[in-house]
């Protein structure tokens, strides 16, 4: 027997749309206002810097001839499918997990769109200290990392806290 969608974690899918809109808008702004390699300092240790990532996190496999585009696209589709099933199986009251899943789905879909449309992922957030620069990333990457951190955090909650959170107390 099927469950009403609003009683499942799918109730939180609106967050996926929020993540996608923020990610898409930020990348479109970069594409419309920056040339590849252009940097704009905002505050000390933080620049906007337009980069193209043909690989995964930290440009993993970026220089491997193009097959990685489809490989990482397939991984993104699989992750989205698994997380959608997990959201459907969870209660809408399990806020922390469902928000985390929505953040990861939104980020994965944002980067998937880039891979399929452009052939690369648009990165633009550049943190640095002195001459050392953290690898450039984007909002989708940020939402994926925050979602993953939320899942880890949820794993550390005591069983009493978990039951209180699921009941909305």
Swiss-Prot record:
Pathway info: Protein modification; lipoprotein biosynthesis (signal peptide cleavage)
GO biological process: proteolysis
Enzyme nomenclature, EC number: 3.4.23.36
GO cellular component: plasma membrane
Spans through the membrane: 12-32, 70-90, 102-122, 137-157
HAMAP family associated with the record: LspA (MF_00161)
Organism, scientific name: Serratia proteamaculans (strain 568)
Topological category with respect to the lipid bilayer: Multi-pass membrane protein
Family statement drawn from the similarity comment of this UniProt entry: Belongs to the peptidase A8 family.
Protein name listed in UniProt: Lipoprotein signal peptidase
Gene (UniProt): lspA
Top-level taxon of the source organism: Bacteria
Localisation: Cell inner membrane
NCBIfam families with a match to the protein in the record: lspA
GO MF assignments: aspartic-type endopeptidase activity
Role summary: This protein specifically catalyzes the removal of signal peptides from prolipoproteins.
Enzyme class, first EC level, given as a word: hydrolase
InterPro entries given in the database record: Peptidase_A8 (IPR001872)
UniProt cross-references to Pfam families, sorted A to Z: Peptidase_A8
Record keywords, A-Z: Aspartyl protease, Cell inner membrane, Cell membrane, Hydrolase, Membrane, Protease, Transmembrane, Transmembrane helix
Active site: 123, 141
Catalysed reactions listed for this entry: Release of signal peptides from bacterial membrane prolipoproteins. Hydrolyzes -Xaa-Yaa-Zaa-|-(S,diacylglyceryl)Cys-, in which Xaa is hydrophobic (preferably Leu), and Yaa (Ala or Ser) and Zaa (Gly or Ala) have small, neutral side chains
